Amino acid sequence: MKNAALCEALPLLATCSHEIPPTPHTVCFVFPPALLLSPSKLTLLNSRRVASRCVIIIDPRLLRLFSCSRPQQLPRDKNQSFAKPSFSFFFFLLTSLLSPF
């Protein structure tokens, strides 16, 4: 997604729920990208707003790929400006962007 770079310098709040309402200072990303075609989801996205956190909104049908069942705050690394997501997230992101929907 073209606005994924906004997450690079932000604390990452990963969630396995699509029910967390976005705030005016939240950038939301919906996976898989096919969900972007849903008009009800388009209101959750704003790539031009400066964000204080990054919320990952994941399709509940994909929860079997993740071990979490509720939102979790990833710990900050002292040497990084943001906490790194797990390898499984990067693998999921890569496969989501490369696979046709």
Swiss-Prot record:
It is found in: Cell membrane. Keywords: Cell membrane, Glycoprotein, GPI-anchor, Lipoprotein, Membrane, Signal. Disruption phenotype: Leads to long chronological lifespan. The lineage of its organism: Eukaryota, Fungi, Dikarya, Ascomycota, Saccharomycotina. Residues 1-17 form the signal peptide. It is a lipid-anchor; GPI-anchor. A lipid is attached at S81 (GPI-anchor amidated serine). It comes from Saccharomyces cerevisiae (strain ATCC 204508 / S288c). This is Long chronological lifespan protein 1. GO terms for cellular component: plasma membrane; side of membrane. The keyword Ribosomal protein does not apply. Residues 82-101 form a propeptide. The keyword Manganese does not apply.
